[in-house]
């Protein structure tokens, strides 16, 4: 398993320091040459500067120049690299993996295998697994993806369910784990969850006959958009007797702050509070140990750092203590036929025979196309380890921070005394243990769209969150030091012009 592979990357010192020549492209390239997992980049298809401007399908993949090669043929340009100025083969600088990851090259093979199976044997694909196919039989694909996800989230396969999408899974988990009473009815969350979480939490509180004004406790940040662990623990203590559920993001999507999940979980559970984590921005980004941390439940999407494709099927974790199916240990849930034990599922019995573990929460037959795409993504992810990805991520993110701070120093030197605010500030914690692969850059008011458009024109893709935040995410699976240098260079030119 990937989790047992020897770690290759060195853990950076604290604080992370860079030499005087670190602001040069030559330095970035020299670091790429030394990176022990640089080969992972070759497993992905990068948009090119030309393909980003496409207006219609043309039957060609990025990095295949017109009149030269189509998918399945041989192209001279190696994807993700280019030594020319030809936009057709020059890869974009893609720093948007925290919103949507790049397409793995394996995805097309896995989906084509699914389509061929369906076309060739129809319904028999539910129970047929071919030796030369990358796929299991359809009824076993979700369990296979769960097994491949085990090292990603730090859980046993039986504690993982691959199903639905993130917000749907949040509702299914809350149906079981948010059981408010007159005494314990509050949910502790944070001030700015991803809006879908906000809507789900509010609707669950209202569904149970309570009011968000009295049943929702929001953790607010300081003036630097930082929520300290001490504040979280103090809030738990303050509301312990009236709180039914603590529901926080592993990484705050807007600021990029990574929370101390094991400490917060232990503190809340010691107070009798159920603990759930939204891992949308943490899964595939930072190492996780959900079982060992004693988390009650967690949910995540798979289209960001796991690269399973837009709107891809999601995942849920349920700790093994909640997965018992005997009459005394059974956890109430909203049930459906695909949560029924596989051995008896097709008996079509009237009584529900739940699958032990998290897969007993599955309701419907999951999409085979979705599972093929996720299986492809996980097959690539597991070529390395969460530990090695994290170590490279620490270096890449620190390098991006170093170069961004260089812009601020140069700007301050050139505009001393003009009274202008700096063009931006980084609101993600500078402590490497309190962030993942994302740096959130809060731009001066009115700059976001102007800067974003200039960067896009330069072939750089970053995520913009109105009104003023640009999220810069060097993904260690496929981004390089040179990518970091080019991204920050484009940002420098945009804000200094």
From Swiss-Prot:
Catalytic EC class: hydrolase
EC number: 3.7.1.3
Residues passing through the membrane, by range: none
Pathway: Amino-acid degradation; L-kynurenine degradation; L-alanine and anthranilate from L-kynurenine: step 1/1; Cofactor biosynthesis; NAD(+) biosynthesis; quinolinate from L-kynurenine: step 2/3
Record keyword Cytoplasm present: yes
GO BP: any one term: anthranilate metabolic process
GO MF annotations in UniProt: kynureninase activity; pyridoxal phosphate binding
Pfam families: Aminotran_5, KYNU_C
Binding site for pyridoxal 5'-phosphate: 166-167, 194-197, 278, 281, 303, 337, 365
InterPro entries: Aminotrans_V_dom, Kynureninase, PyrdxlP-dep_Trfase, PyrdxlP-dep_Trfase_major, PyrdxlP-dep_Trfase_small
UniProt KW keywords: Cytoplasm, Hydrolase, Pyridine nucleotide biosynthesis, Pyridoxal phosphate
UniProt xrefs under Gene3D superfamilies: Aspartate Aminotransferase, domain 1, Type I PLP-dependent aspartate aminotransferase-like (Major domain)
Modified sites of kind N6-(pyridoxal phosphate)lysine: 304
Location in or out of the cell: Cytoplasm
Protein family membership: Belongs to the kynureninase family.
Protein name: Kynureninase
Organism: Pyricularia oryzae (strain 70-15 / ATCC MYA-4617 / FGSC 8958) (Rice blast fungus)
């Amino acid at each position: 398993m990937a989790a047992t592979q020897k770690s290759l990357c060195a853990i950076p010192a604290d604080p992370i320091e860079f030499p005087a020549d670190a602001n040069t492209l030559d330095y970035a390239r020299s670091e790429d040459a030394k990176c022990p997992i640089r080969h992972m980049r070759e497993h992905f298809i990068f948009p090119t500067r030309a393909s980003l401007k496409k207006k219609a399908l043309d039957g060609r993949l990025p990095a295949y120049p017109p009149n030269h090669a189509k998918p399945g043929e041989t192209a001279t340009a190696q994807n993700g690299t280019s030594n020319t100025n030809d936009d057709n083969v020059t890869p974009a600088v893609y720093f948007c993996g925290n919103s949507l990851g790049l397409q793995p090259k394996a995805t097309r093979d896995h989906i084509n295998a699914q389509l061929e199976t369906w076309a060739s044997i129809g319904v028999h694909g539910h129970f047929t697994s071919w030796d030369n196919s990358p796929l299991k039989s359809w009824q076993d694909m979700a369990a296979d993806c769960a097994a491949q996800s085990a090292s990603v989230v730090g859980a046993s396969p039986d504690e993982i369910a691959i199903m639905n999408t993130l917000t749907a899974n949040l509702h299914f988990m809350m149906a079981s784990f948010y059981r408010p009473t007159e005494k314990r009815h509050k949910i502790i969350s944070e001030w700015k969850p991803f809006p879908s979480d906000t809507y789900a939490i509010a609707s669950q509180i209202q569904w149970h006959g309570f009011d968000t004004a009295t049943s929702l406790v929001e953790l607010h940040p300081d003036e630097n958009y930082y929520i300290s662990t001490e504040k979280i623990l103090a809030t738990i203590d303050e509301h312990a007797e009236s709180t039914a559920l603590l529901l926080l993001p592993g990484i705050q999507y807007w600021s990029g702050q990574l929370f101390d999940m094991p400490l917060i979980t232990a503190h809340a559970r010691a107070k009798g509070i159920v603990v759930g984590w939204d891992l949308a921005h943490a899964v595939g980004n930072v190492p996780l140990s959900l079982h060992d941390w004693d988390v009650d439940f967690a949910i995540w999407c798979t289209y960001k750092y796991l690269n399973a494709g837009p709107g891809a099927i999601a995942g849920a974790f349920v700790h093994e203590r909640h997965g018992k199916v005997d009459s005394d240990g059974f956890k109430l849930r909203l049930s459906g036929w695909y949560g029924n034990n596989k051995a008896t599922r097709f008996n079509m019995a009237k009584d529900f025979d739940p699958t032990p573990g998290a897969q007993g929460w599955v309701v419907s037959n999951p999409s085979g196309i979705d599972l093929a795409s996720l299986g492809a993504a996980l097959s690539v992810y597991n070529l390395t380890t969460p530990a090695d990805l994290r170590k490279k991520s620490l270096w890449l993110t620190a390098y991006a921070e170093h170069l961004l701070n260089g812009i601020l120093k140069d700007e301050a030197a050139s505009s001393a005394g003009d009274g202008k605010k700096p063009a931006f500030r980084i609101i993600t914690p500078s402590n490497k243990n309190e962030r993942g692969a994302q740096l959130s850059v809060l731009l001066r008011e009115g700059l976001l769209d102007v800067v974003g458009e200039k960067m896009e024109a330069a072939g750089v893709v970053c995520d913009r969150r109105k009104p003023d935040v640009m999220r810069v995410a060097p993904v260690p699976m496929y981004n390089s030091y040179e990518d970091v240098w080019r991204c920050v260079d484009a940002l420098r030119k945009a804000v200094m012009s």
